[in-house]
């Protein structure tokens, strides 16, 4: 028991060191996934010996330990393969090599510099969805690891896999879920792809899709019109300016608000914590409130942070266990809440304690019990 505890402690310290280092070297990320693999191997061994709590942490089930360890092994092997190619000298961040991004479409590929495009279903800008076009996609093909860019046409978003156009987002399938007329518009930063209203939903199969390709690595657009049966050509037009996205201009505060507080998104640059990628302030609370910080991120990372916070017990009043919202499908994102006696103590905590850049920091006020 003591040996397992010591090894787990050393392993989690290694993981936290990787978070705090925030390296851009692929070798450091290989070491990170090795540490994650060892962590879940230790958890697995503990669970096999009927140990449910280790270092004041709940030990995951055998199935979870096995799945997490396998994911870590998969990422470690993939990164080791990349490290033997010409791409090893590029910048690689924790986000670029995280498991969540690895399993995002296109799956089992490394992806960098995603840019959002909007698809309006039924021609209604209020019925739109955002999709990601990746500037760089790294995939393991027949000739080893290759680097390509995403492309966009009326049919969907794709990349070239060993010379074959491979779609990872099909707009027709999305239209069946979100639209009624099977007609949609694709809106990018400076151009849009339209389909005339007269085009039948079945006509698109009689001819090749419109070949409007937007290569995001050089912002070069090549357009060739595609003829639809019984209708005029699909049209591509350039917009005079970028329309603000709903996600940018109207942040969804329902997930960020807490204890009857109203949340407003505010970017704070290097004030309270220069390592926090985004800090949201919460205001307009009642009179009897206490300052809090919500830390949002992957559950295991938050557990490691909470474990390290034990060194700074004098800098906060209390800290919760990890939890998540039950009304969302994103169960991978968890939260812990830290309570303070006043804002001075909270500011001291932010200045002293180093929080990993992958963890989102949300300032707020919480109603006193």
Curated annotation (Swiss-Prot):
Family per record: Belongs to the papillomaviridae E2 protein family.
Quaternary context: Binds DNA as homodimer. Interacts with protein E1; this interaction greatly increases E1 DNA-binding activity. Interacts with protein L1; this interaction enhances E2-dependent replication and transcription activation. Interacts with protein L2; this interaction inhibits E2 transcriptional activity but not DNA replication function E2. Interacts with protein E7; this interaction inhibits E7 oncogenic activity. Interacts with host TAF1; this interaction modulates E2-dependent transcriptional regulation. Interacts with host BRD4; this interaction mediates E2 transcriptional activation function.
Function: Plays a role in the initiation of viral DNA replication. A dimer of E2 interacts with a dimer of E1 in order to improve specificity of E1 DNA binding activity. Once the complex recognizes and binds DNA at specific sites, the E2 dimer is removed from DNA. E2 also regulates viral transcription through binding to the E2RE response element (5'-ACCNNNNNNGGT-3') present in multiple copies in the regulatory regions of the viral genome. Activates or represses transcription depending on E2RE's position with regards to proximal promoter elements including the TATA-box.
GO MF annotation, one: DNA binding
One cellular-component annotation, GO: host cell nucleus
Record localization: Host nucleus
One Pfam entry name: PPV_E2_N
Keyword terms, alphabetized: Activator, DNA replication, DNA-binding, Early protein, Host nucleus, Isopeptide bond, Phosphoprotein, Repressor, Transcription, Transcription regulation, Ubl conjugation
Biased composition (Basic and acidic residues): 245-257
Annotated crosslink Glycyl lysine isopeptide (Lys-Gly) (interchain with G-Cter in SUMO) location: 296
Name by which UniProt lists this protein: Regulatory protein E2
A biological process from GO: DNA replication
Chain spans, region DNA-binding domain: 289-369
Modifications after synthesis and translation: Phosphorylated. Sumoylation plays a regulatory role in E2 transcriptional activity.
SUPFAM superfamilies to which the protein is assigned, alphabetical: E2 regulatory, transactivation domain, Viral DNA-binding domain
Main location (coarse class): host cell
Region listing for Transactivation domain, in residue ranges: 1-200
Gene3D superfamilies, per database record: 3.30.70.330, E2 (early) protein, N terminal domain, subdomain 1 (1.10.287.30), Papillomavirus E2 early protein domain (2.170.200.10)
Gene: E2
Region listing for Disordered, in residue ranges: 230-257
């Amino acid at each position: 028991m003591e040996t397992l505890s010591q090894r787990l402690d050393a392993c989690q310290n290694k993981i936290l060191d990787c978070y705090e280092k925030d390296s851009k070297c692929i070798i450091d990320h290989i070491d990170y996934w090795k540490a994650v693999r060892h962590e879940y191997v230790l958890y697995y061994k503990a669970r096999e010996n009927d140990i449910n709590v280790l270092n004041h942490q709940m030990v995951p089930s055998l199935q979870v330990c096995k799945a997490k360890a396998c994911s870590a092994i998969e990422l470690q092997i993939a990164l080791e393969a990349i490290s033997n190619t010409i791409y090893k000298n590029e910048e690689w961040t924790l986000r670029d090599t995280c498991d969540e991004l690895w399993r995002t479409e296109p799956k089992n590929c490394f992806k960098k510099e995603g840019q959002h495009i909007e698809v309006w279903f039924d021609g209604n800008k209020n019925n739109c969805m955002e999709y990601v076009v990746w500037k760089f996609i790294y995939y393991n093909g027949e000739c080893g690891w290759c680097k390509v860019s995403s492309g966009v046409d009326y049919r969907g978003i794709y990349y070239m896999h060993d010379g074959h156009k491979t779609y990872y987002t099909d707009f027709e399938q999305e239209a069946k879920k979100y639209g009624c007329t099977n007609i949609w518009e694709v809106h990018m930063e400076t151009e849009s792809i339209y389909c005339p209203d007269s085009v039948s939903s079945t006509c698109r199969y009689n001819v090749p899709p419109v070949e409007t390709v937007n290569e995001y690595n050089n912002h070069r657009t090549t357009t060739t019109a595609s003829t639809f049966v019984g209708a005029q050509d699909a049209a591509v037009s350039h917009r005079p300016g970028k329309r603000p996205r709903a996600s940018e201009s109207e942040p969804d505060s329902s997930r960020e608000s807490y204890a009857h507080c109203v949340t407003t998104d505010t970017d704070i640059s290097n004030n309270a914590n220069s390592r926090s990628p985004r800090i949201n302030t919460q205001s307009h609370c009642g009179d009897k409130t206490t300052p809090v910080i919500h830390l949002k991120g992957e559950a295991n990372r938050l557990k490691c942070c909470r474990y390290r916070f034990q060194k700074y017990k004098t800098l906060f009043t209390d800290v919760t266990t990890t939890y998540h919202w039950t009304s969302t499908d994103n169960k991978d994102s968890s939260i812990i809440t830290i309570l303070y006696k006043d804002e001075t103590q909270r500011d001291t905590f932010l200045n002293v304690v180093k929080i990993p850049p992958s963890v989102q920091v949300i300032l707020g006020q919480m109603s006193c019990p």
